[in-house]
Amino acid sequence: MKEKSYVEDIDRSIYDIRDAEHDAFRMEEGLTPAIIDKLSKEKGDPVWMQQFRLQSLQIYNEMAVPDWGPSIEGLDIDHIATYVRPNTAMQNDWKNVPQDIKDTFERLGIPEAERKSLAGVGAQYDSELVYHNVKDEVAAQGVVYTDMESAMKGEYADMVRKYFMKLVTPRDHKFAALHGAVWSGGSFVYVPKGVQVSIPLQSYFRLNAKGAGQFEHTLIIVDEGASLHFIEGCSAPKYNVANLHAGCVELYVKKGAKLRYSTIENWSKNMYNLNTKRALVEEDGVIEWVSGSFGSHVGCLYPMSVLKGDNSRMEFTGVTFAGSGQNLDTGAKVVHAGKNTSSYMNTRSISKSGGISTFRSSVVVEKGAKGAKSSVSCQSLMLDSQSRSDTIPAMDIRTKDASVGHEAKIGSISNEAIFYLMSRGMSEEDARALIVSGFADNVSKELPVEYAVEMNNLIRLEMKGSIG
């Protein structure tokens, strides 16, 4: 009897669960002031947020679609439902989440992950969080981990108003303005001075509704001398119409603090993923980005770090896998503003079956950023002649006292490596999957073991049928 390969053993169905839609409320399609007012009232916004949404809509209408990057002609905002409320309020006890939603998250492993390796979990379904909880021992340290709406309306209202969309503003680009107008859901995190959160927090975003958008906002403030690892996971079932994800992440890393922000994205192949992420790092602070991008039809994602304080540091480690029908345009940006700052980008991109993978790096060294050091390394692996991989570096150096370097490599899987692994009993497909997993090891080794396994499973799923 022939043994199944480890590629075949993976259950593909868990990533493409499509629930029956039981929405409590679905906003009509389109973008008008009346729709934004309706959304604001539906969510019970304070007056300042209602005004902010309308101002953002005005900016959105004034701005043009960016004329660079992948084509988004297949995305018609007028046919996107910008708000879909699930049939439950947010719960703090997993037992109280409706069974159909609970089944979806349980198949994705969310409750199990919470029990095993997480300090807290937020689970968003369409436009609202359905579950949020933080372990007692973490809350006892003074760590705040709640949903954005509760933070905005409760005791952290002043803090939210102080930081909300100040790092990413509606005028940054058209889809930042769209986010400002229709945002819903997301997480608020505050880590007090000196607190070391020893195990990660996670938010998981699931978009189930057909022809809808998800616009969660994540705001994290890590105070002086504190540290945190935050993990973000994303998935959606595949439909024959476009879905949109245009979330926003704002990270504030105070003096001597450290934040690692990890993302594993497995959006469906009808998704337009137009996310905006930015970090502001103070003196002696450290921001670490770990990113795995495996899904979406079109992806545009360039996390940006502003190294404001002296001796602040940024590291970006990423892997992108573009398969058939995918155009993933990703990368990272860094602005060196303080003295003796450092940044390091280390990325891997994989393309197969005609997929297009583009890596854009942007390094800016301000005039006063003496002693800045930056290193960019991008390696690409193309699995066939139909695929494409591009590297587009940009450097703006305004001081002579800086060290900046860029390295790019492109290659393919050697026949010798395939032959060697097959001589050890592997099938050709398994051999290719193993080599690709090793190529992406720079990201998986930075994740907790449960998430490293998940990422390697996603690579194996993408590699299925890669022969011929």
Question: How does the language model describe each region?
Answer:
Residues 2-20, 25-30, 451-467:
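Intrinsically disordered, low-complexity terminal tails
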Residues 16-19, 33-37, 282, 396-397:
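Short acidic (Asp/Glu) and glycine-rich catalytic loops that position anionic groups and cofactors
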Residues 2-6, 10, 26-172, 176-177, ...:
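N-terminal amphipathic, basic helical "cap/leader" segment at the start of enzyme domains
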Residues 131-133, 137-426, 440-468:
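Conserved beta-strand/loop scaffold segments within soluble protein domains that form the structured core
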